[in-house]
């Protein structure tokens, strides 16, 4: 009897031990295993996940995110994860290849920027912004790294809120049973971001100096969202002493504008700092791009918020001191694309430059797809125009009921599609006309005339695509009418605009935002 009782007790003990093991396993399995790319993504994701998951980071401190390439081990980590979160394809350029290589369909892939439009980055040749309602343009570039679009959105607290919201929404959709916790965690984290945003706004909205000079042009969104101007300089790094020639030119530049600080992405070596101070009369300071924190720094309590507040404190060394407006060392705005060229540079073009199937952007203006563009333009104008005013202006410019145009360069035909009805005409080249705009920049209209006597309103057409010589167009503004070419030359307010028919509305919005 005793043996039976002991056997029963043993079985019960084993059963409870097994139950406990199972419970622990279920608890562990209930946690979402998330792999992130680099520090800001890790930080934001942890803010959303809380205690409902295990969040890891591929790139350790000291790794350059722009140059990172995942190892086979890294790819396996992603493969074995429940979710993979990254910032943007313009930052982690390798992600598209990794997506294709994944064999597991269970991995939820989250893009931090979501549908956020980005501004132009280095490598994007056609950057312009409309500064005066007559297509004034401005080129943007970033020192050191080559991006079609600038991915450094996390350096603006205002935009970081959107990144956290995107991560929250994607993970909540993938794990509905945890959505309530994710939303609560995100709400707490976003409140902290809103406080940081308020601190930046309060400190910088009335800045005495609106421009700051940096060696690492990663702070474009921060500058845009808080009313500042980021001035990027070349030929200066935190660990290599500038050449004598560079010191000489930098010294002149610093003295011309009374520049007191040049910002680096990390502490400049003592030798570089001393050289800058002695030879150029300027101090070196650090604005962290927040691409990584060491374990030691994190254990010491440093995080996104402490570093961003330190950045603000350092930035105020410049913004709190009144001074003259600081301009870039070189004026990069007067390019051909922006409307500055010599007459002899203008060459004849053929209709084949515009061959293809093209769609009007007007429907995307109407359905709100382009709304982010107007917000960006309003901020770039620094109070000159509101987002609503920009939308009204472009509504007039883009408005058309010709939703599609098909151009056959070989046959020299243009097919206009209106409400599904097609009209095709054959065109001959009629020359070019250089127009001068009120701001002093210029544009070229390339003119064509229909052979058919019944072409009506499509008798005369003029292309404008910011190019002045033969090249394949990426988009264009088109003017048409039945009276004369001369009458069309006077049309400056209405310029129906067309992009490739293979592009989505968001892709078109992104291209427009980079112009």
UniProtKB/Swiss-Prot annotation:
The GO biological-process annotations, alphabetized, read as: cell adhesion; zinc ion transport
- Keyword Transmembrane among record annotations: no
At the highest ranks, the source species' classification is: Bacteria, Bacillati, Bacillota, Bacilli, Lactobacillales
Signal sequence interval, chain numbering: 1-28
Region described as His-rich loop: spans on this chain:
129-148
**Gene3D superfamilies (UniProt xref):** 2.40.128.20, Nitrogenase molybdenum iron protein domain
InterPro entries from the entry?
AdhesinB, Bact_metal-bind_prot9, Calycin, Lipoprotein_PsaA-like, ZinT_dom, ZnuA-like
Write out the residues that bind Zn(2+). Answer: 66, 152, 216, 291
> Family assignment?
Belongs to the bacterial solute-binding protein 9 family.
Instruction: From the record, give the transmembrane residue ranges.
Output: none
The molecular function terms in GO held by this entry are: zinc ion binding
Alphabetic keyword roster: Ion transport, Metal-binding, Signal, Transport, Zinc, Zinc transport
> What's the domain remark here?
The His-rich loop facilitates the closure of the zinc binding site and is required for zinc acquisition.
- Give the protein name, as stated in the record: Zinc-binding protein AdcA
Please describe what this protein does: Part of the ATP-binding cassette (ABC) transport system AdcABC involved in zinc import. Binds zinc with high affinity and specificity and delivers it to the membrane permease for translocation into the cytoplasm.
Q: Identify the stretch(es) annotated as Disordered.
A: 125-148
Q: To which species is this protein native?
A: Streptococcus pyogenes serotype M18 (strain MGAS8232)
């Amino acid at each position: 009897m005793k043996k039976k009782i002991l056997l029963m007790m043993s079985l019960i003990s084993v059963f409870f031990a097994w139950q406990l093991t199972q419970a622990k396993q279920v608890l562990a399995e209930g946690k979402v295993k998330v792999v992130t790319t680099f520090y800001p993504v890790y930080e934001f994701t942890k803010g959303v996940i809380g205690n409902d998951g295990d969040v890891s980071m591929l790139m350790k401190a000291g790794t350059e995110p722009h140059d990172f390439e995942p190892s086979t081990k890294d790819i396996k980590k992603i493969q074995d994860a429940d979710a993979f979160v990254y910032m943007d394809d313009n930052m982690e350029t390798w992600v598209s290849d990794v997506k294709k290589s994944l064999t597991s369909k269970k991995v939820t892939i989250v893009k931090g920027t979501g549908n956020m439009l980005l501004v132009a980055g280095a490598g994007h040749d056609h950057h312009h912004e409309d500064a005066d309602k007559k297509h004034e343009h401005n080129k943007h570039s970033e020192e050191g790294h080559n991006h079609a679009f600038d991915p450094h959105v996390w350096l603006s607290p205002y935009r970081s809120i959107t990144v956290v919201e995107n991560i929250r929404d994607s993970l909540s959709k993938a794990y509905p049973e945890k959505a309530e916790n994710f939303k609560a965690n995100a709400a707490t984290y976003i409140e902290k971001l809103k406080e940081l945003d308020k601190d930046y706004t309060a400190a910088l909205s009335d800045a005495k100096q609106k421009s700051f000079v940096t060696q690492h042009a990663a702070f474009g969104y921060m500058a845009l969202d808080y009313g500042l101007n980021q001035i990027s300089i070349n030929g200066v790094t935190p660990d290599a002493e500038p050449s004598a020639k560079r010191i000489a030119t930098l010294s002149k530049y610093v003295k011309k504008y009374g520049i007191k600080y040049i910002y680096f992405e990390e502490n400049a070596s003592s030798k570089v700092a001393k050289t800058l101070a002695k030879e150029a009369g300027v101090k070196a300071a650090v604005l962290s791009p927040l691409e990584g924190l060491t374990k030691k720094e994190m254990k010491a309590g440093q995080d996104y918020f402490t570093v961003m507040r330190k950045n603000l404190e350092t930035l105020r060394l410049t913004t709190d001191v009144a001074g003259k407006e600081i301009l870039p060392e070189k004026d990069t705005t007067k390019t051909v694309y922006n409307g500055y060229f010599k007459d002899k540079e203008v060459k004849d073009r053929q209709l084949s430059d515009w061959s293809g199937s093209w769609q009007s952007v007007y429907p995307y203006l109407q359905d709100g797809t382009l709304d982010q563009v107007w917000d960006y333009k309003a901020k770039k104008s620094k109070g000159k125009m509101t987002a609503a005013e920009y939308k009204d202006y472009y509504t007039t410019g883009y408005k058309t009921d010709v939703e599609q145009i098909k151009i056959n360069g070989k046959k020299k035909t243009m097919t206009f599609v209106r409400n599904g009805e097609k009209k095709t005409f054959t065109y001959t080249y009629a020359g070019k006309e250089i127009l001068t705009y009120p701001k002093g920049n210029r544009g070229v209209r390339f003119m064509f005339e229909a052979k058919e006597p019944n072409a009506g309103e499509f008798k005369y057409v003029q292309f404008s695509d910011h190019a002045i010589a033969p090249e394949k167009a990426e988009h264009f503004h088109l003017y048409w009418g039945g009276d004369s070419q001369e009458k069309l030359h006077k049309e400056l307010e209405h310029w129906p605009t067309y992009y490739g028919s293979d592009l989505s509305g968001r892709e078109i919005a992104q291209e427009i935002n980079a112009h």
